């Protein structure tokens, strides 16, 4: 028997390997390579939002008070979009608009682009974090894929929509009441609620909530009686091998109610993933359509008949009049820099009035 004197060459560990080990070390808050993007951008986005809602006015961009310092509360404070005249400028602090003057930067709305762009990158960093940890733990990356839904909504609403319009001004400001104003704006100027992509989004989100409630209730209903404690939750051990609820009983229950039921846990849970994420994706596609000013359903025949026949009106024609009212009364206040003036005779009056 012969023995080989050959030996495997020892791979030299470089600085990258050492850094890779350190950055992926098991610690209380995992960092990882994704953390290099996530943590700085999330910190700056949140810090910018807190700074803006606390101190920064929207007087120069919207003619509004929007900070705690001016008397706004949590629901009415916001980091407002830049002035319409700024177009799609990134509004860098050192750019030609502000020239390094931070007060001027605040006045022009520079915090909004700061929060929007850092917020978008932080969401992407969080998605990459889920990919990275999935790889390290050895599981499939469906959490990251599901999180693409919120990312698609954020990017379409806060970035793609204003890019299709004349400026960042028409994006939503970062605040509760500001988002509600944006919803009314979308309805008045785009008839958003009649858009089929919005309908699919509503079906996905509400359908996902319904599936979540049904699934949770069904599991709670079919738990095994496997503990002596007064609280059934104490009977569960994270490392136990046996099932904690009866899929067979759950299947029998829903088969009796609907005549059809899930018999495959994997398909059931994929469906619970698919429905809400598809709703988010479809609504994002719809928002991009609005960015391009694409029209959805226009039932022109009903509008013509309503204009000719004082006794004919449908819920659709009433909604069209409501949209006209939103535009007519909202635009002068919403866009004060345009100096809109609508005489009384052009304001919408429905047949029922």
Swiss-Prot record:
Topology with respect to the bilayer: Multi-pass membrane protein
Catalytic activity as recorded in UniProt: 2 a plastoquinone + 4 hnu + 2 H2O = 2 a plastoquinol + O2
Residues given in the record as Fe cation binding sites: 215, 269
Pfam families reported in the protein's UniProt record: Photo_RC (PF00124)
Residues holding chlorophyll a ChlzD2: 118
Segments traversing the membrane: 41-61, 125-141, 153-166, 208-228, 279-295
Record NCBIfam families: psbD
Name used for this protein in its record: Photosystem II D2 protein
Any one of the GO CC terms: membrane
Binding-site residues, pheophytin a: 130, 143
Free-text cofactor note: The D1/D2 heterodimer binds P680, chlorophylls that are the primary electron donor of PSII, and subsequent electron acceptors. It shares a non-heme iron and each subunit binds pheophytin, quinone, additional chlorophylls, carotenoids and lipids. There is also a Cl(-1) ion associated with D1 and D2, which is required for oxygen evolution. The PSII complex binds additional chlorophylls, carotenoids and specific lipids.
């Amino acid at each position: 028997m012969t023995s080989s004197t050959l030996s495997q060459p020892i791979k030299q560990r470089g600085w990258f390997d050492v850094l890779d080990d350190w950055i992926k070390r098991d610690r209380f808050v995992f960092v990882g390579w994704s953390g290099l993007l996530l943590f700085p951008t999330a910190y700056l986005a949140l810090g910018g939002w807190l700074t803006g809602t606390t101190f920064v006015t929207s007087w120069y961009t919207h003619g509004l008070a929007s900070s705690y310092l001016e008397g706004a509360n949590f629901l009415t404070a916001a980091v407002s979009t830049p002035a319409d005249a700024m177009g799609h400028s990134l509004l860098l602090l050192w750019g030609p608009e502000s020239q390094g003057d931070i007060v001027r930067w605040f006045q022009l709305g520079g915090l909004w682009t700061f929060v929007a762009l850092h917020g978008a990158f932080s969401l992407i960093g969080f998605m990459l974090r889920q990919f990275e940890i999935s790889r390290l733990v050895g599981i499939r990356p469906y959490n990251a894929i599901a999180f693409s839904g919120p990312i698609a909504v954020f990017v379409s609403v806060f970035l793609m929509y204003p890019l299709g319009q004349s400026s960042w001004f028409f994006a939503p400001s970062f605040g509760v009441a500001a988002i509600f104003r944006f919803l009314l704006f979308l309805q008045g100027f785009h008839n958003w609620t009649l858009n089929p992509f919005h309908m699919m989004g509503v079906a996905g989100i509400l359908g996902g909530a319904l599936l979540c409630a049904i699934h949770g209730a069904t599991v709670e209903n079919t738990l095994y009686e496997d503990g002596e404690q007064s609280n059934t939750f104490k009977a569960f051990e994270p490392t136990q091998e046996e099932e904690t609820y009866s899929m067979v009983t759950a299947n029998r229950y829903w088969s009796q109610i609907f005549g059809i039921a899930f018999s495959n846990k994997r398909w059931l849970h994929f469906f619970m993933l698919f429905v809400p994420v598809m709703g988010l994706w479809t609504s994002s596609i719809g928002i991009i359509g609005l960015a391009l000013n694409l029209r959805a359903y226009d039932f022109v025949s009903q509008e013509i008949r309503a204009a000719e026949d004082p006794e004919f009106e449908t819920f659709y024609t009433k909604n069209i009049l409501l949209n006209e009212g939103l535009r007519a009364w909202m635009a002068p206040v919403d866009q004060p820099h345009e100096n809109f003036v609508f005489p009384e005779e052009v304001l919408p009056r429905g047949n029922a009035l």
